[in-house]
Curated annotation (Swiss-Prot):
InterPro entries cross-referenced by the UniProt entry: Peptidase_A8 (IPR001872)
Annotated pathway: Protein modification; lipoprotein biosynthesis (signal peptide cleavage)
Assigned GO CC terms: plasma membrane
UniProt-listed Enzyme Commission number(s): 3.4.23.36
Any Pfam family the entry gives: Peptidase_A8
Family: Belongs to the peptidase A8 family.
Keyword rRNA-binding: no
Organism (species): Burkholderia thailandensis (strain ATCC 700388 / DSM 13276 / CCUG 48851 / CIP 106301 / E264)
Signal sequence, start to end: none
Protein name: Lipoprotein signal peptidase
PANTHER family to which the protein is assigned, alphabetical: LIPOPROTEIN SIGNAL PEPTIDASE (PTHR33695:SF1)
Length: 166
């Protein structure tokens, strides 16, 4: 049986929104620090496989649709806002499901962190650059990391739930 935060059919929304707010805060603070420290495209090697850099992503994950002409800014902003509404609804209904709600809170914080970038700058600020030799993974940020961790936890929670139903 799932651990609960409350006895009601739903759960408290505030703790999950608090987690999302923490994600947004750390995401935005790191982006501001990078913007104040680095010139566009500049790279600072921290380890043989990790750099800090400043990249503008006008598209979505991995630069998808980055050169589409500008409409994608508003499409991805609308998608992020739509995801926010759906996630808030799910958190309100299922807030007592801790792992499910944690995963959604991380995804929500990450999505809103990138929506804020699109609204303020017209693009997303990416700065984490992992590489092996000359091969570089696409640069990303803390919001992207929160979305990824949230998605992995969401899959894990669903697999655990399905396995428990057998």
């Amino acid at each position: 049986m799932a651990k609960t935060l409350s006895k009601s059919s739903g759960g408290a929304l505030a703790p999950w929104l608090g987690i999302s707010l923490i994600v947004i805060l750390f995401d935005q603070l790191t982006k501001i620090a990078v913007l104040k420290t680095f010139a566009y495209g500049a790279m600072h090697q921290l380890t043989p496989f990790f750099n800090l850099t400043l990249i503008y992503n006008r598209g979505a994950a991995f630069g998808f649709l980055a050169t589409a002409g500008g409409w994608q800014r508003w499409a991805f902003t609308a998608l992020g806002i739509g995801a926010t509404l759906v996630i808030c609804y799910l958190l309100k209904r299922h807030g007592h499901q801790r792992l499910f709600s944690l995963s959604l809170a991380l995804i929500l914080g990450g999505a809103l962190g990138n929506v804020i970038d699109r609204l303020i700058y017209g693009h997303v600020i990416d700065f984490l650059d992992f590489h092996v030799g000359a091969w570089h993974w696409p640069a990303f940020n803390l919001a992207d990391s929160a979305i990824t961790v949230g998605a992995v936890l969401l899959i894990y929670d669903e697999l655990r739930r399905v396995r428990g139903a057998r």
